[in-house]
Amino acid sequence: MKHILLLVTIFLSNFLVAQTKINGQVIDFDTTIPVAFAKITYESKTFMTDWEGKFSITVSDFKKPVYVAYKGYYEKSSYPVNNGKLFIVKMIMNINVKNNEVYSDQKINLIIKKVYEAQSKNDPEKALTNFQYKNYEYLQISANPDSISGKIDTIQKRNIFGKHKIKLDSSNYRFKKLVEKNHIYQTEKVNLIQQNKKTQKETILGTRMAGFKEPVYEYLGLKLLSYSVYENPFEILETPLQNPISNIGRKLYVYKLIDSVQHQGRKTYRVYFQPKKIRSNRLRGLLHIDAESFAISKAQYRIYGIVNIEATYTFDYLKEHNLWFPKKRKFLVKKGTNNQDLKILGNTIKFNSSSEEKINKNASDRAYLTIESTPFDLKLGDYQQINDPKIKIDLPRSSFNKDEKYWAEFAKDSLDKRKLKTYVSLDSLSTANKIEHKVFLGKKIFNGYIPVSILDIDLRTLIKYNNYEGFRIGLGGVTNSKLSEKYKLGFYGAYGFKDAEFKYGITPSYLLNKKSETWISASYSDDVSELAQTSFVTDSRKFRLYDPRPINISTFYNIKTAALILESKVFPKLNTYFSISQNEIQPLFDYTFVNDGKNYTEYSISSVLLGLQWNPFSNYMNTPLGVIEIEKRHPKFSLQYTQTLPDVIGNDFTFSKIDFKTFYEVPYLSGQKSSILFQGGIAFGDVPLTHLYSVAPNNINKDAILQRITFSGKNSFETMYYNEFFSNKYTSLQLKHTFNKIDLGYKIAPEFSIVTRMAWGEINKENQHLGLAFKSLERGFFESGIEANKIFKGLGLTAFYRYGPNQLAHFDDNLSIKISYFIDLGF
């Protein structure tokens, strides 16, 4: 009997081994992007991976290999292991294959073409003239406690001198204890979406953010994911992507018809899409396409890169309208291949690099962000009266203080015990650490102010340096709403230790209209200004600890200005500025302007100025504190017109100036970004040198390269010397591409950018200007270079080289090496 039992045991063991099921996934070796529909061969059986590169096999002999093949890769043989983990097969790209792109067959191309052509009748936002619905959205940042080790780790670190340092790290233990009790962060909102023939608008009915009595307005305007699957560009994490069902997208993606299935009683095609270049981190996913109407009935998207993103859209079929209407959106963000710190929503979720600590996985790397959005109370056909259609989102104060009973109606998961504890815990933490006040303070500092009682102190006025004034010490500010919401008083005073002169300015203002933020101001100032500087009065103000360009400037002029100013945002996408001013000007260098046979070493100019900034692609939110820009989209356009007043007392010259600027920035999900800055100006009439164009030079007139090492500017020409060129009309173009940080170890992680700048200009009536020798930009000016920013503690290096018709005779005179400095204020 014992022998029989032994034989049965051996037989069953062999049988179970023979039936071992292994789950696996095929990925790219370098990018970790899954390889969809790779060919799997095991024991003469052949099948394909699914659209996420996953597969299952029943292994009978672990000594026999699994063969994997896919176009553009070397064939891979790999032996499965029975360890309960996912069996990963890493494919290596065959660089000898000239064309690694994959292509769609004609049938699926025809289906996608019909989807594109039928958008107008299938996209609810286009097919329905009038509708409204409410939407509940819940955002959560959390982690699975079971995925985190609770052990206290011993970490060995080596400093820059090679010495070892051992320390205990309890961060994983503390993180596990935190997420066992509550989520890391959460926020939720209920909004009303209305649409008529002309526009769509969102009104927030209720909102709450853990740790805040009043929500952070900027978050409520974030567009982390497109509402519509038909939208082009399709947006993920505020990054525009070409939609795979757009006209351009059809040229960038390849499609595969998997099969057809029944979905809500209708035949649908399941179609997989991926980039033609299979290693690209562009969008890929699975579309369910109605076989009759060619509408999207379900969509699943994936992105694999510095973050891994999953997005799922589900729809309900409305039979009476022959339309698929959104049912739910789910969005998941996890850490991807990035080994640098990655921040999402400011500092709220932060994935840390584990390269220094040499541990398998940081606890924070287990964190994930989820968003779930559910429409309800759909009403079709009724005309929707939309107030203020130019405002994209309305945020009334009544939405802030909804009680727990209100939110209980939307609770989807009664088993989530951590949700309520998260609000209680973070509200207490926020109160204890004054987080809400710190956010308020951070916004002020970001704009260059720090609040002190009824005053907002202007941080830009405290200390400056330039070659003319030396150190400039001062104090300035503006009264805030604690004193009055209708009136404000701006002021500053400063003293230059090198020129031994006092400068000052005062600007009282009155609010004419709160809704349009229309202010009327009077201003008087006695100060100095940079020679031939071009500034746009509608540019937004952001705090910079220092402005590097003026440090090396020696040519200034004294200007006493009395002005009346009107500023308004009557149209949300258009900022307007109008002023009439009288200016007394005295150049503080050797200069004479010759006009109509008369020599001027000082002069008066009376003028009007109209400045416009148009942001046609941005969206705006109406908040209790006013209208704010929420979706800062490009391009943006600035236009400025200046006209002197010949018949006004105190005006010596007649001239006009027109200035234009546009900026366009393209972010990529890889973390890289590209930007274009185009700027131009033209001046007509008798224009003194103080009001011509110098095109922002930033190179000092010294012989040796090392003597010219100073701080680099933001958009300045680094190899152009001060006062080298002046123009009465010019154009300039700047192209820039910024790459991801490169981790070199020891906390050294430079962010590289390649930059090319060029400018052309002309000057007429050159003989009117005496005292300064300068050249014309008629033949053009060209420079290119590399920026290695944020190498260590915000410090970096830049190197630029000057070439083209205005190249100088000696090599080192064309070369510019500068120090860059960036401060991360954390918001």
Identify the function of each model-found stretch.
Residues 38-41, 66, 102, 133, ...:
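Hydrophobic beta-strand segments
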Residues 87-105:
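Conserved "repeat-terminator" motif of extracellular CCP/Sushi domains
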Residues 103-268, 276-282, 350-454, 458-464, ...:
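Structured extracytoplasmic
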Residues 32-35, 56-63:
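Short Pro-Gly-centered beta-turn/loop motif in secreted/extracellular proteins
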Residues 236-239, 374-376, 380-827:
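Exposed, low-structure sequence patches enriched in small/polar residues
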Residues 42, 65-78:
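A short, solvent-exposed loop/turn motif at the edges and junctions
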Residues 19-36:
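Structural motif
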Residues 45-54:
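Short, acidic Ser/Thr/Gly-rich low-complexity loop/linker segments typical of extracellular
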